[in-house]
């Protein structure tokens, strides 16, 4: 019997295991014409899911209490009555946290495990890579020789942003929360500089030291005081990509930030929110470039793989707490 993981209640502040519940599904998994039966193989857990657990208005609807959570999943086709999919093929898509489920095929993409490991289609050649590539290119408009700062740099998106920056000839500075992560950024991902925000008393000064010529592009994954410190160091015509704000996702009230307008006005800087699905028409080209770079070994990636469907909620909590390297994925 297949199981699902549902949102039991809306978290107040930091989510806990009690906010999730397991449900045994007794629904019919008979495949009708135009449908496929899927079995989950890998589940992506991501910071944006925290926002969907609240009922606040956002760019995607909130999860419903008592119903399954959904995220990016790679699944195997167990049975098919859909003309586009065959038994034994693998697909990725936004699917519910269920061991098995029926799909009408909408939103599914075939994945070729001969080109990359299945888990990579949730990461570097999936939405993670697309977010990094398109955010940097479409808003960052990078030019060789410029300085790029990445917060949440040891995370799934941040680590790819930094590597793309190096491919494009940028000076790349990464911000992360442990010395081990800083070492990884420089030794494995090729970042030029790293700043441990947890052991740095004056982030403004640390950024100024690492970027004596100022910051041209800031890829913001965290928000909060770290991002405030970067603003003090931006150059004229700087571009700031707002991709996430994990530092405030668990806050019951969003804290007041430094007033950004003076920094933007005096530097003629651009600050823009980024949602990857708004650039869906550019996915094929971006995927092609990411796959090429991966094949040329210009890109590398880190994954934290958690074994077992039953451990998905804990994997989400650990991801939110920074207890991972690179992309957090559950192997079902």
What is the meaning of each model-derived region?
Residues 225-298, 332:
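Glycine-rich phosphate-binding loop and adjacent beta-alpha segment
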Residues 298-305, 313-332:
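C-terminal capping/lid region of NAD(P)-dependent oxidoreductase domains
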Residues 154, 158, 162:
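N-terminal Rossmann NAD(P)H-binding glycine-rich loop of SDR-like oxidoreductase domains
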Residues 152-153, 222:
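NAD(P)H cofactor-binding loop motif with strongest signal on the N-terminal glycine-rich segment
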Residues 128-131, 156-157, 226:
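Hydrophobic/small residue at the entry helix of a nucleotide-binding pocket
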Residues 71-76, 84-152:
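NAD(P)H dinucleotide-binding glycine-rich loop of Rossmann-like/cofactor-binding domains
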Residues 166-229, 277:
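Adenosine-nucleotide cofactor-binding segment
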Residues 29-45, 53-97:
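Glycine-rich beta-strand-centered segment in the early N-terminal region that forms part
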């Amino acid at each position: 019997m297949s199981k699902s993981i549902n949102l039991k209640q809306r978290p107040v502040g930091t989510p806990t295991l009690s906010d999730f519940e397991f449900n045994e599904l007794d629904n019919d998994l008979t495949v009708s014409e135009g449908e496929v039966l899927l079995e989950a193989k890998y589940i992506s857990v991501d910071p944006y899911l925290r926002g969907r657990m609240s009922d606040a208005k956002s760019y995607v609807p909130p999860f419903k209490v008592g119903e399954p959570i959904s995220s990016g999943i790679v699944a195997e086709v167990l049975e098919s009555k859909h003309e586009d999919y065959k038994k034994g093929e693998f697909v990725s898509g936004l699917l519910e946290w269920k061991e098995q489920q029926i799909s009408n095929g909408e939103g599914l993409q075939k994945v070729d495990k001969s080109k990359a490991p299945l888990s990579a289609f949730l990461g570097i050649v999936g939405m993670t890579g697309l977010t990094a590539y398109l955010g940097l290119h479409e808003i960052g408009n990078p030019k060789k020789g410029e300085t790029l700062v990445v917060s949440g740099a040891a995370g799934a998106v941040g680590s790819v942003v930094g590597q793309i920056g190096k491919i494009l000839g940028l000076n790349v500075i990464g911000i992360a929360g442990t010395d081990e992560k800083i070492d990884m950024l420089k030794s494995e991902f090729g970042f030029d500089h790293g700043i441990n925000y947890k052991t740095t008393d004056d982030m403004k000064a640390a950024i100024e030291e690492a970027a004596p010529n100022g910051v041209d592009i800031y890829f913001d994954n965290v928000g909060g005081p770290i991002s405030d410190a970067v603003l003090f160091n931006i150059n004229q015509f700087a571009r700031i990509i707002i991709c996430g704000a994990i530092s405030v996702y668990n806050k019951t009230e969003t804290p007041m930030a430094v007033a950004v307008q003076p920094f933007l006005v005096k530097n003629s800087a651009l600050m823009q929110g980024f949602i990857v699905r708004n650039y869906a028409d550019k996915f094929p080209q971006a995927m092609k470039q990411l796959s090429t770079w991966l094949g040329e070994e210009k890109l590398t990636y880190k994954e934290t793989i958690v074994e077992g469907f039953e451990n998905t909620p804990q994997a989400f909590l650990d991801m939110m707490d920074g207890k991972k390297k690179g992309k957090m994925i559950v192997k079902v």
